[in-house]
Amino acid sequence: MANLKSLAKDTAIYGLSSIVGRFLNYLLVPLYTARLAASSGGYGVITEVYSYTALLLVLLTFGMETTFFRFVNKEGGRDPMRVYSTTLIAVGGVGVAFVALVLGFLPQIAAALDYADHPEYVGTMAVCVAIDAFQCIPFAYLRYRRRPIKFAALKLLFIGLNIGLNLVYFLLLPALYARPAWHDVVACVYDPSVGVGYAFFINLACTALVTFFFRRELTGFRYVFDRRLMARMWHYAWPILILGIAGILNQTADKMIFPRIVEGPEGKVQLGIYGACVKIAMIMAMITQAFRYAYEPFVFGKDREGDNRDTYARAMKYFVIFTLLAFLIVVGYLDVIKHIIAPGYWDGLRVVPIVMAAEILMGIYFNLSFWYKLIDRTIWGAWFSGAGCVVLVAVNVAFIPTYGYMACAWAGVAGYATAMLLSYFVGRRYYPIRYPLRSIGVYVLLAAAFFAVMQWLPAAWPLWARLGVNTVLIGLFAAHAVHYDFPLRAWPVVGRYFRKRS
């Protein structure tokens, strides 16, 4: 239990940067959807470009984040800084080569991506993602050194700067530009024709600035590139790279494929609607990411202490409970939450429960995936994620022409379910863990039943009545969890009032 409390503490701190940070980032969703009309397709451009940058981030880190944790725990007792410096040099060198390649062939690459009129979008995000990839290693080092406070502070610094500058360039400066008294002054730093491009330029500026705060993590030691160590690390990392590519394609392939099937301005419009509504569903991604930040170093660290399979099983159960609770909360209050995006985008709200379900499956798959990392058989992850990716792409290609972006949402469910089931059944043979499936199944059925009731409530009911019923259902789910798995007597502070007196 002490191990799980340590995990919960780190998850809470990392979650501050992930959950609170992404929540603050939601300020950009109403901002973009308000300033970029759905019919303009501007938010579709943002959605598509960021889907490519997500894939590039995986390619440029090429599995070295997880590999760093494995090797710094496995061999770092002798010389952890050798592992760290080798990783930094490798990722940094690949990033520099990538930027040089993109800038050297910028017109051709921009034309291939249908951005021939705006090659600056491509060039800006290429530099941005290279810096971001390099920063992943110092961030990983902070996690290794158990310094979640600085980790969270830097993540929140980036988000705060990003939000602030976006508010300036998409809200304040356009308003001042329209006033004759301010027009000439504002014109020195603002050009309305740049439009959506400011989102990318601001991202680059904020990313570059954060790098300067890694001075202590990037100085004070001798940089050494150990070729033999790098060869062993690459042998461990390349299956993780394939796993990462397949995994990120599971998250972004729909946004890359959609404008290729639904061509022209209409494709960008529909992609923008889908992308805006997916942002609402990303609360599940926040929880999964916060859990991952704490769970990865936790698992590799505990592996050195012996067999902790019971701990992993309980962690899985708690993850499922909290993600299902988050699912019910978002769906139950969707009529309120939807106001973070402009009404012109509300047609896509029906994808929210589906995308959230897909994110839960992805989180379960992530939890299941540690068995092959712990036994150094990461190639299995590549096969599982690859199979899921094939299913996702096939569903998208087959059904987007008929069902539009609804096919994108269901494709995510199909892809993650495939990878999850493969990992579970193969893992039972190589690294069996006795997960409390019966208890987990009860929570899943309970959440499914409550979700069905929420969906079947008459639309003619007043908002307060629907929200009232949904609140009761959410409370019943939480009460079940408290009664069976989180008894009040075990809670800090309040627990003493519920313990039996002898």
Model-identified regions with their sequence ranges:
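Interhelical loop/hinge segments that connect adjacent transmembrane helices in multipass membrane
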Residues: 1-7, 177-198, 208-251, 294, ...
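Signature of the first transmembrane helix
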Residues: 3-66, 95-103, 128, 163, ...
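Membrane-water interface segments that mark the loop-to-transmembrane alpha-helix transition
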Residues: 9-21, 49, 58-107, 116, ...
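Transmembrane helical elements of multi-pass membrane transporters/channels
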Residues: 10-25, 199-214, 218, 227-300, ...
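Interfacial/gating helices of multi-pass transporter permease domains
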Residues: 29-54, 119-120, 192-198, 232-236, ...
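Specific pore-lining/lateral-gate transmembrane helices of multi-pass inner-membrane transport
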Residues: 73-90, 273-385
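Hydrophobic alpha-helical transmembrane segments
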Residues: 123, 152-218, 386-391, 405-426, ...
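Membrane-proximal transmembrane or re-entrant/amphipathic helices at the cytosolic face
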Residues: 455-502
